[in-house]
Curated annotation (Swiss-Prot):
Its EC number is 6.1.1.15. This is Proline--tRNA ligase. HAMAP family: Pro_tRNA_synth_type1. One of its GO terms (cellular component) is cytosol. Catalyzes the attachment of proline to tRNA(Pro) in a two-step reaction: proline is first activated by ATP to form Pro-AMP and then transferred to the acceptor end of tRNA(Pro). As ProRS can inadvertently accommodate and process non-cognate amino acids such as alanine and cysteine, to avoid such errors it has two additional distinct editing activities against alanine. One activity is designated as 'pretransfer' editing and involves the tRNA(Pro)-independent hydrolysis of activated Ala-AMP. Coiled coil: none annotated. Keywords: Aminoacyl-tRNA synthetase, ATP-binding, Cytoplasm, Ligase, Nucleotide-binding, Protein biosynthesis. Gene3D superfamilies: Anticodon-binding domain (3.40.50.800), Bira Bifunctional Protein, Domain 2 (3.30.930.10). It comes from Shewanella pealeana (strain ATCC 700345 / ANG-SQ1).
Length: 570
């Protein structure tokens, strides 16, 4: 590709509204352009990378025995009503009506549509197991789209769905998809880790996420220092306390704390140990009888919202109560809330259930209770695992301790069981002629998100460093002053032709530009191999070669350059 015929829209300056490196570099490299919040156009450089990832995903899915189909992005709302997700999915599901006042949704996922297809097309166990996939645009009306294509409203996804009459074939397909995802990420040249995960709004029994490792990742991965155990922190079980509750040693006292609205301020101003404090968080309840629920965790712990959402009394999806609702129910603001005397259901983390002589808000603005003790000052509350595990705590697997690292989720696989097939009456006749409800699996890969994840893992202060398999171009040709030197122009043109003939994807910078600009663009875009052609090199019978990842420079004889570049890709 000649740059003079190409839309190369690079930028020198880092956009002010781009928070993460991948978003910054995708804008600067001219890969994407924002059309509206969470909506992006893919320009030529970005699209080339996207299509390469898509091709690898398609190859591995086909190899694993999945069959490609294509379903509509616009889906009839009736199908979502059948499964109950029309209401449960929340505002991320974009709902609209056509000119005939019929309800539709823009698909964030396709479980309903695929189940509808299979219940109409498959009626016998002889047609199973069946694994179908598509690569299709999705839409989720994110409340705060951010990080470019990492968390956009519209995105490209590969989603596969499998159907089974028995658990044995379900397990076999799940393992095949697990391996296919591992193969995809390996071929992309990315460091990754599969982890056990929560099934979330999609539901089901077994689930694994695939994370590209990056310091900028939104997800925390908890893994054992001495085994293969790894889980999203949302899923990782915190250890039960090994100690017992100590006897009370002090009376409960009411203390003025006008300037202590956070645990940190309470600890600093009043000298109480953070392990002797609790946080009382008010969340929305699941019933009209209990519209608010209190969740209590230790002051130095973090609430695990996924675990809290699993409480029957808590509304799903999980949502904190707003300040107005809290004041109306309790008479105090969030900085002064505590479990003593609360007129609502109270649930505590296991670590809180063994505390004694602890401090908490007094449900009066600017006041706290110190010296609180269970049974004496407030009734025992049901205890659950409601917190995030902490680095250094024992691993749930029983081997080693927990360490934490950050990752970007790019894939997720589930065993759904009969969640959707039962709701939508997707049944087949088994070998005995009896009707059986289908078992389902679903397997998603964020194709567009993988582009951003690859950049987060592969960049430096000059730009992107693409893994070879997904670089927009493999080789860049930089002819120095070719518009003034016929020798440079002729040799550059010949090399361009030779590399194209060899099946190597080339970006030929034939612009009338300063060498500094040309070098900067090649490094920003992340072309893995760059060949520099100048009169001085030609006099010596050499090309100058530079490797983008290592920064290594070499002089390569003119007649050996094509074979040399072929070898770099092997």
């Amino acid at each position: 590709m000649r740059v003079s015929k190409y839309l190369l829209s690079t930028q020198k300056e880092t956009p002010a509204n781009a928070e993460v490196v991948s978003h910054q570099l995708m804008l600067r490299a001219g890969m994407i352009r924002r059309n509206a919040s969470g909506l992006y156009s893919w320009l030529p450089t970005g699209l080339r990378v996207l299509r390469k990832i898509e091709a690898i995903v398609r190859e591995e899915m086909n190899k694993a025995g999945s069959v490609e189909i294509l379903m509509p992005m616009v889906q009839p709302a009736d199908l979502w009503v059948e499964t109950g997700r029309f209401e449960k999915f929340g505002p991320e599901l974009l709902r609209f009506q056509d000119r005939h006042n019929r309800d539709f949704v823009l698909g964030p996922t396709h479980e309903e549509v695929i189940t509808d297809i299979v219940r109409k097309e498959v009626n016998s166990y002889k047609q199973l197991p069946l694994n179908l996939y598509q690569i299709q645009t999705k839409f989720r009306d994110e409340v705060r789209p951010r990080f470019g294509v990492m968390r956009s409203r519209e995105f490209l996804m590969k989603d596969a769905y499998s159907f089974h009459i028995d658990q044995e074939t379900m397990d076999e397909t799940y393992e095949a998809m697990f391996q296919a995802y591992s193969n995809i990420l390996t071929r992309l040249g990315l460091a990754f880790r599969p982890v056990m995960a929560d099934t979330g709004s999609i539901g089901g029994s077994m689930s694994h996420e695939f994370h590209v490792l990056a310091n900028s990742g939104e997800d925390l991965i908890a893994y054992s220092t001495e085994s293969d155990y790894a889980a999203n922190i949302e899923k990782c079980e915190a250890p039960l306390p090994t100690e017992t509750r100590q006897a009370a040693t002090s009376e409960m006292t009411l203390v003025d704390t006008p300037n202590a609205k956070t645990i940190a301020e309470l600890v600093e101003q009043h000298g109480i140990a953070i392990e002797k404090t609790v946080k009382t968080l008010i969340v929305k309840g699941a019933t009209e009888e209990a519209p608010l629920v209190a969740i209590v965790i230790r002051g130095d712990h973090e609430l695990n919202e996924v675990k809290a959402e699993k409480l029957d009394a808590v509304l799903a999806p999980f949502e904190f109560a707003d300040e107005a609702a809290i004041r109306d129910a309790i008479g105090a603001g969030t900085g002064s809330i505590g479990p003593v005397g609360l007129n609502m259901p109270v649930f505590v983390d296991h670590s809180v259930s063994i505390m004694s002589d602890f401090g908490a808000g007094a449900n009066q603005d600017g006041k706290h209770y110190f010296g609180i003790n269970w049974e004496r000052d407030l009734p025992e509350a049901p205890a659950f695992d409601l917190r995030n595990i902490i680095e250094g705590e024992p691993s749930p697997c029983g081997k080693g301790t927990i360490a934490l690292l950050r990752g970007i989720e790019v894939g997720h696989i589930f065993q759904l069981g009969t969640n959707y097939s039962e709701a939508m009456n997707a049944n087949v006749l088994d070998q005995n002629g009896k009707s059986q409800t289908l078992l389902m699996g679903c397997y998603g890969v964020g194709v567009s998100r993988m582009v951003a994840a690859a950049i987060e893992q592969n960049n430096d202060d000059r730009g992107i460093i693409w893994p070879e398999a997904i670089a927009p171009f493999t080789v860049g040709i930089l002819p120095m002053n070719m518009h003034k030197s016929h020798r440079v122009k002729d040799i550059a043109e010949q090399l361009y032709q030779d590399l194209n003939d060899a099946g190597i994807e080339v970006m030929f910078d034939d612009r009338k530009e300063r060498p500094g600009v040309m070098f900067a663009d090649m490094e920003l875009i992340g072309i893995p191999h760059v060949v520099v052609i100048g009169d001085r090199n030609i006099d010596n019978g050499m090309f100058e070669y530079k490797n983008r990842r290592t920064g290594e420079k070499q002089d390569i004889p003119l007649d050996q350059i094509v074979e040399f570049l072929k070898a770099q890709q092997a």
